[in-house]
């Protein structure tokens, strides 16, 4: 199925005053929405200060082998590596590194309101798949268009437009996202493409850049084709992605290694996001238990008051 979108009007721009029902409608129709002022400038500055050292020490995307693409198919694991970028840093472990991430990001009320609308009826509880700082240096080439749900084998079996979505991403701008410094490129409506629609990897006329000011966010479904743009500027481009999915799925990023004292400084909701609490599916059946008991009870887990 091919879906035609008016590029001049998408992604729609919303703020916290926009009715949540309208926001969800835009996400389901276009696959993405831009949120103005998702985080305030002071919070962005605190987050930047907490991650700066780790980003500076971090290495660029994983090296990949050079394949003769005309001679045969490139292994899928190498395709994944190419998506990491030779001049892009992926700084992970945010829940350990940043107090602002633990307190402000993981408890973001609007973010959770969106997740509840997307997942509640279909799946029940949800948790964090992963969270990264995405730092693009000048000279980084455009990333190929892809769907983040490709990490799930089950995504190949989604066939109908009304099949449930099982990943939603919140990409927050920590610096400006401009067309010349690698703003994320989105193909609105591509979450509705079925197997009959040939995938688009580079240079799509249907793609639009997500132009953002620091603190803005683009919220997009994992089934939407997207990719980081080319950084033709002299500035780095930095963002933070927080990926959420149903509790049914195993996250890409584990948080078992977090010291208990750090986890106990978090709210119950934030603890759930990093897998330190038992959750329920859409039928109120417990998921992620310790025997027949809740993880938090077995661990005698303390928590911070609601943030």
Curated annotation (Swiss-Prot):
List of residues binding Fe cation: 146, 148, 226
Native source organism of the sequence: Talaromyces verruculosus
Pathway the protein acts in: Secondary metabolite biosynthesis; terpenoid biosynthesis
Subunit organization: Homodimer.
A molecular function GO annotation: metal ion binding
Annotated protein name in UniProt: Dioxygenase cdmD
Recorded superkingdom: Eukaryota
GO biological process, any: terpenoid biosynthetic process
Function: Dioxygenase; part of the gene cluster that mediates the biosynthesis of chrodrimanin B, a meroterpenoid that acts as a potent blocker of insect GABA-gated chloride channels. The first step of the pathway is the biosynthesis of 6-hydroxymellein by the polyketide synthase cdmE. The prenyltransferase cdmH acts as a 6-hydroxymellein 5-farnesyltransferase and produces the hydrophobic metabolite verruculide C. The FAD-dependent monooxygenase cdmI further converts verruculide C into verruculide B.
InterPro entries the UniProt entry points to: Phytyl_CoA_dOase-like
Family: Belongs to the PhyH family.
EC numbers for this chain: 1.14.11.-
The keyword Metal-binding is annotated on this UniProt entry: yes
Enzyme class, spelled out: oxidoreductase
Catalytic activity: verruculide A + 2-oxoglutarate + O2 = chrodrimanin T + succinate + CO2; chrodrimanin E + 2-oxoglutarate + O2 = chrodrimanin A + succinate + CO2
Disulphides: none
Gene that produces this protein: cdmD
Keywords carried by this UniProt record: Dioxygenase, Iron, Metal-binding, Oxidoreductase
């Amino acid at each position: 199925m091919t879906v035609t979108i008016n590029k001049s009007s998408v992604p729609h721009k919303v703020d916290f005053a926009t009715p949540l029902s309208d926001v969800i409608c835009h996400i389901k129709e276009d696959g993405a929405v831009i949120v103005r002022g998702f985080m305030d400038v002071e919070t962005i500055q605190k987050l930047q200060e907490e991650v700066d050292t780790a980003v500076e020490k971090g290495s660029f995307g994983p090296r990949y082998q050079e394949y003769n693409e005309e001679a045969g198919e490139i292994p899928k694991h190498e395709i994944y590596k190419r998506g990491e970028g030779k001049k892009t840093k992926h700084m992970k472990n945010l829940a350990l590194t940043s107090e602002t991430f633990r307190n402000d990001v993981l408890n973001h009320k609007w973010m959770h309101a969106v997740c509840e609308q997307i997942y509640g009826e279909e799946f029940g509880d949800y948790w964090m798949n992963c969270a990264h700082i995405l730092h693009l240096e000048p000279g980084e080439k455009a990333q190929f268009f892809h769907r983040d749900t490709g990490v799930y084998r089950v995504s190949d079996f989604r066939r109908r437009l009304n099949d449930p979505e099982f990943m939603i991403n919140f990409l927050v701008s920590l610096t400006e996202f401009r067309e010349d410094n690698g703003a994320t490129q989105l193909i609105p409506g591509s979450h509705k493409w079925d197997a009959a629609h040939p995938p688009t990897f580079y240079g799509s006329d249907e793609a639009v850049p997500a132009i953002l000011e620091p603190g803005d966010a683009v919220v997009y479904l994992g089934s939407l084709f997207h990719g980081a743009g080319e950084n033709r500027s002299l500035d780095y481009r930095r963002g933070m992605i927080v990926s959420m999915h149903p509790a049914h799925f195993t996250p890409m990023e584990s948080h078992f290694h977090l010291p208990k004292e750090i986890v106990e400084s978090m709210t119950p909701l934030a603890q759930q996001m990093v897998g330190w609490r038992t959750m329920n599916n859409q039928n109120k059946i417990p998921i992620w238990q310790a025997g027949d008991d809740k993880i938090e009870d077995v661990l005698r887990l303390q928590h911070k008051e609601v943030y």
